[in-house]
């Protein structure tokens, strides 16, 4: 009984353990089959160690491992590799390649691959448009030079038609015919239309004299530009050139803003000693550049900005037109001209025939002094007749030679011309030598002290200093002096031309010329003369007025809503 029970329990345990083993075996077989089947038909995982070797080579691993790419991927990689190598020769394939080497199955252009980025294509395109590479040096090998089209027919041989037919070339005439023929597509010195040079620009009529091409900068323009043009032209003396009184130590005013230690005195408080002062020309106005009214007002009576600013200039000196070269001779090589500052002083000099443009007048011994020596005997006795060598003048200096104005001591004309400040840069050190004297200029370079016959034409509205009474006259109304006239081609034209803007009538001409220009209509308004560049303090008080339509043409310029608004206002005023 016991044995039977024991055997039965043992058999049950055997069945139980055997079933567990069978279950474990079944689970293991299922897992193994899953692992086996999972390896079929797919590539290996990216994190396997040897995957990098298989990637890019196009070849799978050893036959022991079933992890090589499918046929589709392998064929694509071979095709892409071949296509990439072929793309390196653009003149054979013409393929525009992306900027990355194709390796995996992916869209041709992605965020990492953009179009037209092949360097060979860029080089080929640059050569095509620039033509900057020779045939033998072309990087892409595709550049071809641009060639001008040849003539369709050759030159007709010389001959004559007779009753017997056409006779050939006469002996000896072939070379002459070739020399007279220009086998070209272009004509020399032939323009399609005739050039007509008019005016300085828009809004100015053709009756205004113009020289030197279109929009050239060395011509006189109307006052409606601003009075700066009047005071910057060649042929003007520096205002204040004959002002006397005061000592050098006291007159160093310059500008209170930029030189706070300067002693500033009114004209009435300056000592009465007369200081030698010659004719100060525009070409010598260098040194301290005048600064306009900026900030604090200097403590000087009637100060109006740059009009009273002091600028360092030469003392009793006048440098000649030899482009900064000193004159030859013993002792002081810079002759003192008109040392006492008298209006009719002696000792000035002229240049012979400076208005001529011939080489004879540009070179050689042309300078000489004139008139007897002055009272002080500074100039040599018996007048100065020593010739001087004048270097060849530049084109710009020749342009200035057509103006005839002279310093206060000039007794004959023409005198040596002055320079335009813009054409004489500060780097000319000889022009800046000996600038140890301060003087008080006016608003610009209009000479208020020399008579009009010596070139002082234009506006004269600055106070002058009376050296005898030691007083400053009060400013008067603006006075137009007569325009300088003469038979010379003063402004470079072929006819007698007065100063275009030297009188009110000429200014009215400019006003009429600009009348049809609706944008420049208010430019020539005479009220603007009260706020010109010579009176910067008045410019501070200038109140611009709004443009008001006062005729039908002006109304047409306005939009429809503005016209209705103005009409409503007009009707409202009429009802009142």
Curated annotation (Swiss-Prot):
Keywords recorded for this protein, A-Z: Capsid protein, Late protein, Virion
Keyword Chaperone (UniProt): no
Membrane-spanning ranges: none
Hydrophobic as annotated region, ranges: 13-35
Domain of life: Viruses
Entries under InterPro entries matching the protein: P2_DUF5899
Pfam families, sorted: DUF5899
Positions of region (Disordered): 322-348
Main location: virion
GO cellular component: viral capsid
Compartment annotation: Virion
Induction (free text): Expressed in the early-late phase of the viral replicative cycle.
Summary of subunit composition and partner proteins: Interacts with the major capsid protein.
Domains (record comment): The hydrophobic region might anchor the protein in the underlying inner membrane.
Functional summary from the UniProt entry: One of the minor capsid proteins that constitute a network internal to the major capsid proteins and outside the lipid membrane. The minor capsid proteins glue and stabilize the capsomers. Also acts as a molecular tape measure protein that determines the size of the viral capsid.
Protein name: Minor capsid protein P2
């Amino acid at each position: 009984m016991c044995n039977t029970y024991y055997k039965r329990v043992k058999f049950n345990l055997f069945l139980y353990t055997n079933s567990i083993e069978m279950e474990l075996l079944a689970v293991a077989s299922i897992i193994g089959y899953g692992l086996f089947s999972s390896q079929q038909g797919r590539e290996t995982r990216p994190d396997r160690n040897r995957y990098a070797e298989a990637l890019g080579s196009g070849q799978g691993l050893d036959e022991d491992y079933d992890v090589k790419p499918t046929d589709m991927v392998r064929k694509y990689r071979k095709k892409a590799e071949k296509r990439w190598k072929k793309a390196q020769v653009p003149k054979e394939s013409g393929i525009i390649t992306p900027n990355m080497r194709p390796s995996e199955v992916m869209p041709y252009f992605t965020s990492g691959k953009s179009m037209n980025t092949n360097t060979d294509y860029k080089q080929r395109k640059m050569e095509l448009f620039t033509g900057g590479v020779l045939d033998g040096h072309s990087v892409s090998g595709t550049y071809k030079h641009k060639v001008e089209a040849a003539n369709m027919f050759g030159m007709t041989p010389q001959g004559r038609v007779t009753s017997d037919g056409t006779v050939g070339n006469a002996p000896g005439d072939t070379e002459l015919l070739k020399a007279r023929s220009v086998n070209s597509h272009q004509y020399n010195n032939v323009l399609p239309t005739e050039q007509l040079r008019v005016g300085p620009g828009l809004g100015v009529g053709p009756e205004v004299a113009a020289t030197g091409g279109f929009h050239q900068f060395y011509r006189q323009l109307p006052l409606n530009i601003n009075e700066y043009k009047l005071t910057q032209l060649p042929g003007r003396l520096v205002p204040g050139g004959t002002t006397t009184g005061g000592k050098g130590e006291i007159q160093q005013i310059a500008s209170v803003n930029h030189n706070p230690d300067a002693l500033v005195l009114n004209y009435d408080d300056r000592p009465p000693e007369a200081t030698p002062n010659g004719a100060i020309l525009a070409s010598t106005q260098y040194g301290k550049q005048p600064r306009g009214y900026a900030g604090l007002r200097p403590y000087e009576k009637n100060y109006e900005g740059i009009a009273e600013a002091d600028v360092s200039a030469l003392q009793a000196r006048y440098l000649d037109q030899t482009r900064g070269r000193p004159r030859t001779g013993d002792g002081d090589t810079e002759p003192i001209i008109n040392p006492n500052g008298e209006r009719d002083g002696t000792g000035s000099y002229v240049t012979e025939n400076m208005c001529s443009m011939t080489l004879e007048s540009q070179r050689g011994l042309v300078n000489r002094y004139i008139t007897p020596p002055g009272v002080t005997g500074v100039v040599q006795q018996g007048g100065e007749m020593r010739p001087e060598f004048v270097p060849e003048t530049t084109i710009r200096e020749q342009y200035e030679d057509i103006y005839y104005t002279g310093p206060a001591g000039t007794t004959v004309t023409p005198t040596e011309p002055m320079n335009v400040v813009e054409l004489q840069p500060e780097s000319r050190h000889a022009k800046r030598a000996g600038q140890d004297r301060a003087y008080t200029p006016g608003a610009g370079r209009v000479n208020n002290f020399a008579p009009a016959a010596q070139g002082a034409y234009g506006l004269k509205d600055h106070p002058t200093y009376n050296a005898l009474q030691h007083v400053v006259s009060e400013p008067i109304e603006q006075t137009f002096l007569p325009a300088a006239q003469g038979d010379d081609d003063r402004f470079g034209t072929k006819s007698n031309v007065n100063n275009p803007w030297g009188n009110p009538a000429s200014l009215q001409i400019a006003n009429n010329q600009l009348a049809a220009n609706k944008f420049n209509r208010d430019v020539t308004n005479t009220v603007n003369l009260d706020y010109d560049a010579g009176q910067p303090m008045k410019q501070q008080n200038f109140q611009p007025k709004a443009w008001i339509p006062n005729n039908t043409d002006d109304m047409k310029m306005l939009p429809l809503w503005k016209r209705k608004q103005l009409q409503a206002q007009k009707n409202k005023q009429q009802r009142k």
